């Protein structure tokens, strides 16, 4: 039980996918303009990452390995992720049409989010079992969500702040992301992973 908690803390804080491993930067910069959109994207990505981790583990261990076709791993994981994203898109469209409109093109772009494929491949590389794969996927999603929501809140405050003209827009966003990354470096050594 303790190792599962350490795995979760490690993926959320110590080895954060956005700020430490630099995966998922496209939605991090693209959706973080408004807090409401960032929260919606976080929920959708959490669902997709967790379900994709679970599904990719099952595909790897019950289809690819028994048939000896491990060389199709990346292609099959992309297919699994596309199916999970389509399922998520249908669920969001039915349950929250407003959120569906707010997310717009970013919802289908979860398919191309490198963090989702990265989690699936890293699960295999780390040789996680089924439960560890789900926890790793969920932890990566929580870490992504935490960073995305914090960054969106900071960007909303920066939009109304008195920022010097040369630093407005993308410049101050990159500086803020760098400072967030430095803050997360403070968690290094918290968990040996």
From Swiss-Prot:
Membrane-crossing residues?
Answer: 4-24, 39-59, 63-83, 102-122, 134-154, 171-191
The protein's topology relative to the membrane is: Multi-pass membrane protein
- Transmembrane among keywords: yes
According to its UniProt entry, this protein's organism is Pseudoalteromonas atlantica (strain T6c / ATCC BAA-1087)
What family is this?
A: Belongs to the NqrDE/RnfAE family.
Q: Name one GO biological process term.
A: electron transport chain
Q: What does this protein do?
A: Part of a membrane-bound complex that couples electron transfer with translocation of ions across the membrane.
Q: Where in the cell is it found?
A: Cell inner membrane
Please give the Pfam families that the UniProt record associates with this protein: Rnf-Nqr
- The answer, when asked if Transmembrane helix is one of the entry's keywords, is yes
What name is this protein filed under? Ion-translocating oxidoreductase complex subunit A
